[in-house]
Amino acid sequence: MDVNPTLLFLKVPAQNAISTTFPYTGDPPYSHGTGTGYTMDTVNRTHQYSEKGRWTTNTETGAPQLNPIDGPLPEDNEPSGYAQTDCVLEAMAFLEESHPGLFENSCLETMEVVQQTRVDKLTQGRQTYDWTLNRNQPAATALANTIEVFRSNGLTANESGRLIDFLKDVMESMDKEEMEITTHFQRKRRVRDNMTKKMVTQRTIGKKKQRLTKKSYLIRALTLNTMTKDAERGKLKRRAIATPGMQIRGFVHFVEALARSICEKLEQSGLPVGGNEKKAKLANVVRKMMTNSQDTELSFTVTGDNTKWNENQNPRIFLAMITYITRNQPEWFRNVLSIAPIMFSNKMARLGKGYMFESKSMKLRTQIPAEMLANIDLKYFNESTRKKIEKIRPLLIEGTASLSPGMMMGMFNMLSTVLGVSILNLGQKRYTKTTYWWDGLQSSDDFALIVNAPNHEGIQAGVDRFYRTCKLVGINMSKKKSYINRTGTFEFTSFFYRYGFVANFSMELPSFGVSGINESADMSIGVTVIKNNMINNDLGPATAQMALQLFIKDYRYTYRCHRGDTQIQTRRSFELKKLWEQTRSKAGLLVSDGGPNLYNIRNLHIPEVCLKWELMDEDYQGRLCNPLNPFVSHKEVESVNNAVVMPAHGPARSMEYDAVATTHSWIPKRNRSILNTSQRGILEDEQMYQKCCTLFEKFFPSSSYRRPVGISSMMEAMVSRARIDARIDFESGRIKKEEFAEILKICSTIEELGRQGK
């Protein structure tokens, strides 16, 4: 079914077609090679924005540090990071004045969070800088490695304790004179294979102990590893993003918890909510400004863009904000929250993999690791790289660059939003004390500013004042990239507002199509995406029906499961035709077994197995959903699964879809090649760790479980919990006496094994 796209636009108002101009179809650009150049750009730019600051040297690490705070007031429109502490504190005070009790209540909520968060919170997240191996690892592994090293160095770390206890260990680790770590290395040797008599490379993994001095350990603890941000659309150049290590993460988590709690209570904040809730919040602010601009007032909106938000922010300003927000709180709480900004003031940026050189004539390739950049002869580099390296050299220590000013991407999204909102808050008439006033929306570095005034001069004056106020706290509104319009038409975080939010449908385009998980999940995700877009994104019935037909077509081509009565020949058609002929009720066959499609836009909410269950032959039902069938996935079946959907813009979203386990919900096995590398042990550790965590959560389903009193290990806690639960179930008649006895027997066996293991 081929569609002429111009037909889609016959009745569409122009503003709704804005979304088709976005660079969202097709594959996004990915980066190749190293991110070293991008990271050096970031470090050099950040220092350039703060160049008039004061230089100092960190006494512990010897790193040169630039502090632009309370630096010169800007004299031109160039971006700069010279925030004035007193201005920031005043903005905070006014924010509190217009929201009585805001900080107090948020602190109380956060204290609760700090008391209850468990260490396993840090296992969430993807790649994390693992300081023990000096490279990136999955979060769970990096945490396990950190805890293991802490233990072997006499710290009390335990992986089922509270996060706050782990953070105490982090603090203690920084006072130690040295830390002993275990590093992995590979030995390669050529040996002759007995069977084939060929020479093969045999790899063995060695572990060796290494001592880190206090200085080296501190550098690693303060290091952010850098990578190139992938899949960014609409940009010519790539840019670097950072991933911090386990020492920093926990502290950042608590600061962001406090800031999130504040943002939730601020009507101008576009975080932490999303989707329709965010749109409603924004529409409220716009409505307020439009109803207040009676016939006498003009109302204009700036679709704002800030220049290099992260690189002009400063951790010292965040420290000042936290000090103010928590000023009436207990000392321990203030200390915990102030550590993250202090660590960021002393952060080091790891320069990534380094540079790859190749000689065309000699067919040689060689890698220059980042550690060598400090003293390698620069004649090998081209001019632009040479300039970068020369500039960054004074900042290098042990292959990392000292980067005191600036924040790396995505670290303090919530707290920086609070700073932005505090400036928007100053637009009330009681603060501007003149005829113009402003309000707006802030979401991390994105903002929309609504200015009301009796005439155009007033609007201009209002925007100017906003611009200059921002400069005082290190926010640089870009005059080139921001534009102003009559209120009613603007864009904010890729939502387009035109007397109400217009669905930016093309943003969702990348999430249509076949995900490639397995036949069962893909069918479910595909129809759920269409259903969700009908609910949230103005996907009309005709277009949805068309999307559905295109999806089914795509699905059949992907899994080669064309209808049993089709003429199309594929590898599977012989088997599928045979099944088609043997089946009495052909409508009952799943699409992935060559059956017909019974979906239409009215029944997208029903999983396909349920939709066709009554129509299936009995023996087909038995094969499809029989738990004894070795092909039915045996992992525990949750009724809802989560898929990661990639919209074209913004973070990957988690989307729920109905999961019915059948022979089609297979899980592909992991690529075997990893099992022959140094990663193998790490992989096994990670799986063990994940299994233990999952098991523990099964026993203690509430997420804020307190530790069972007086119990030392996870295993004992689970056994004691199992006994209690079994007794309750037995006494209430939910399980029989034999089952109860069997559970107690298993518990005793586990305890016995545990004792032998000790």
Swiss-Prot record:
Record region (Disordered): 53-82
Reaction it catalyzes: RNA(n) + a ribonucleoside 5'-triphosphate = RNA(n+1) + diphosphate
Family statement: Belongs to the influenza viruses polymerase PB1 family.
GO cellular component: host cell cytoplasm; host cell nucleus
Subunit and interaction comment: Influenza RNA polymerase is composed of three subunits: PB1, PB2 and PA. Interacts (via N-terminus) with PA (via C-terminus). Interacts (via C-terminus) with PB2 (via N-terminus); this interaction is essential for transcription initiation.
Domain RdRp catalytic: 286-483
Pfam family, one: Flu_PB1
Keyword Protease set for record: no
Keywords: Eukaryotic host gene expression shutoff by virus, Eukaryotic host transcription shutoff by virus, Host cytoplasm, Host gene expression shutoff by virus, Host nucleus, Host-virus interaction, Inhibition of host RNA polymerase II by virus, Nucleotide-binding, Nucleotidyltransferase, Phosphoprotein, RNA-directed RNA polymerase, Transferase, Viral RNA replication, Viral transcription
Sequence motif Nuclear localization signal, location on chain: 187-195, 203-216
An example Gene Ontology molecular-function term: nucleotide binding
Amino acid composition bias (Polar residues), ranges on this chain: 55-64
EC annotation from Swiss-Prot or TrEMBL: 2.7.7.48
HAMAP family on file: INFV_RDRP
Domain of life: Viruses
Entry protein name: RNA-directed RNA polymerase catalytic subunit
GO biological process, one term: symbiont-mediated suppression of host mRNA transcription via inhibition of RNA polymerase II activity
Species, as recorded: Influenza A virus (strain A/Chicken/Hong Kong/220/1997 H5N1 genotype Gs/Gd)
Protein modification: Phosphorylated by host PRKCA.
Subcellular location: Host nucleus; Host cytoplasm
Function: RNA-dependent RNA polymerase which is responsible for replication and transcription of virus RNA segments. The transcription of viral mRNAs occurs by a unique mechanism called cap-snatching. 5' methylated caps of cellular mRNAs are cleaved after 10-13 nucleotides by PA. In turn, these short capped RNAs are used as primers by PB1 for transcription of viral mRNAs. During virus replication, PB1 initiates RNA synthesis and copy vRNA into complementary RNA (cRNA) which in turn serves as a template for the production of more vRNAs.
Annotated segments matching region Promoter-binding site: 249-256
